Amino acid sequence: MTETAATETTPAAPPAEPKQKKKQQPKKAAGGAKAKKPSGPSASELIVKSVSASKERGGVSLAALKKALAAGGYNVERNNSRLKLALKALVTKGTLTQVKGSGASGSFKLNKKQLETKVKAVAKKKLVAPKAKKPVAAKKKPKSPKKPKKVSAAAAKSPKKAKKPVKAAKSPKKPKAVKPKKVTKSPAKKATKPKAAKAKIAKPKIAKAKAAKGKKAAAKK
């Protein structure tokens, strides 16, 4: 009985595998769809480039556009419908002006007025962006000079303490004023003594003169 039960249970296992395969298949399909997306510039970008590169004054025709795109490696046959839709969209936006024909057929030119406005708008954005950054830098700069103000205030307070030694310099002036008075008196006394000596020296000259006169009188006699 056990063998028969084992044989009956074994065929029930295989049907579970196809369910797992069915779940995995849509994931692969999604991955394949992502890989099929075209890489590179879009049809509208290629059309604008080819029209801007052309030097024809009367505009570029649809046939000339297809030739230029095919020369650049674009598959025109597969993407013919995309090219027509892109041309119509560019005309409605105003990037291209239709010179001749209607719809996708005809000749097309770049709308220079719209290009000039776009260039001016981009230039204005570039000029406005640096102006917004300048006030932020100006606010940060005044914060740094606040610290040196504290240092200068402390330096201004410190020289006030240095004024105290001036009071100590006033005390030695008193003894200097007293000493020169005593010194001036002593030389005055010494100067009076030599006058008496001169008077004494002058007396013997008078005596010598009298003696000379007496000698002359005796000689006359």
From Swiss-Prot:
Domain of life: Eukaryota
One annotated Gene Ontology cellular component of this protein: nucleosome
Major location (coarse): nucleus
Biased amino acid composition, Low complexity: 1-11, 27-44
This protein's record includes keyword Transmembrane: no
Subcellular localization, as worded in the UniProt entry: Nucleus; Chromosome
Keyword Nucleus attached: yes
The H15 domain, residue ranges: 39-112
Residue spans of biased composition, Basic residues class: 123-150, 158-221
Span list, region Disordered: 1-44, 123-221
Signal peptide (UniProt feature, chain positions): none
GO molecular function: DNA binding; structural constituent of chromatin
InterPro entries listed in its UniProt record: H1/H5, Histone_H1/H5_H15, WH-like_DNA-bd_sf, WH_DNA-bd_sf
Keyword set, alphabetical order: Chromosome, DNA-binding, Nucleus
Biological process annotations from GO: nucleosome assembly
Transmembrane segments: none
Protein family according to the UniProt entry: Belongs to the histone H1/H5 family.
Function: Histones H1 are necessary for the condensation of nucleosome chains into higher-order structures.
Protein name per Swiss-Prot or TrEMBL: Histone H1C
Organism: Xenopus laevis
Lineage: Eukaryota, Metazoa, Chordata, Craniata, Vertebrata
